[in-house]
């Protein structure tokens, strides 16, 4: 077991906390503050325990000097200050005397945030490649380290693994958000209430191979939608018209279907159109009758009903990836239907594994109907694959 924040003595300590404040921005304004809100319980806990808090995060990718102008965390510090109802000192540096002196002048109960960790990527990708000197330097700025950024836990960066490895034995822990992610996703996969129904969507089988292989040994049924369904349907010998397909993954899809012993459930109908756009004529056909000149862009009503019949029986549901082209209203009905089916469950643990399916549930107003909506897209996927997450692995054991 990894240490959690409640295992650390924080009194009067300088607490380095890696958060995931990689929020969407438009014209310098934050368009969705969910990730900041999710970190508040851990932040408040630190402040209530008489500590000095030093926060940092990445924001987008920083490839050229010009990126700095649109990738500063200044607006995030201002938003956090507003949400906390207290001043957050922002230091627009990632190292140096100005930052060090601001940290040394912090009093217990005060908050400082320093600049986007990926500004360090401009000079040889020091953050993303976990430069040992950078990890050591950042670790030297505090007494203890808390990692509450689940979204980057599947990456070994200087700001998570680098600090954890250099902060000293027993001085690192995960925050409440990471603890919650590990608990819900971990239990759903490794010790689920049954039946466990997994619903996987999205465009590519290649993104989900590891997840399907891991879940084949653990789930009772795996319902497959999204464009990746066409690789499976073609593997079964069906004509899929001009639908998106990964031809180099057909053998793998055949193999997964053969291994699945009926656990994998494929769509029985699909919504088709002649082009990948919303304002176009569309119709629904059975998967055996897809014309040569049409492409499937969503699961059909019969499939929604079929999937619903499995979802209704579930005691645990894990959902990752939309059922169709959710951003186009004519091809969003499958995702909406599945989302509603899961939201209607009253006696089940329901988990959304981040990314587009989380956005769908939130935009449909169903966020509070799910047991847990993950904050990490790639990290959730790797965790569902049964992989070790470097950002968690580097944390002190209890």
Curated annotation (Swiss-Prot):
It comes from the Bacteria. ATP binds at residues 208, 296, 327, 354-357. It catalyses: (2R)-3-phosphoglycerate + ATP = (2R)-3-phospho-glyceroyl phosphate + ADP. GO terms for biological process: gluconeogenesis; glycolytic process. It is found in: Cytoplasm. Pathway: Carbohydrate degradation; glycolysis; pyruvate from D-glyceraldehyde 3-phosphate: step 2/5. GO terms for cellular component: cytosol. It is an enzyme of class 2 (transferase). Its EC number is 2.7.2.3. Monomer. This is Phosphoglycerate kinase.
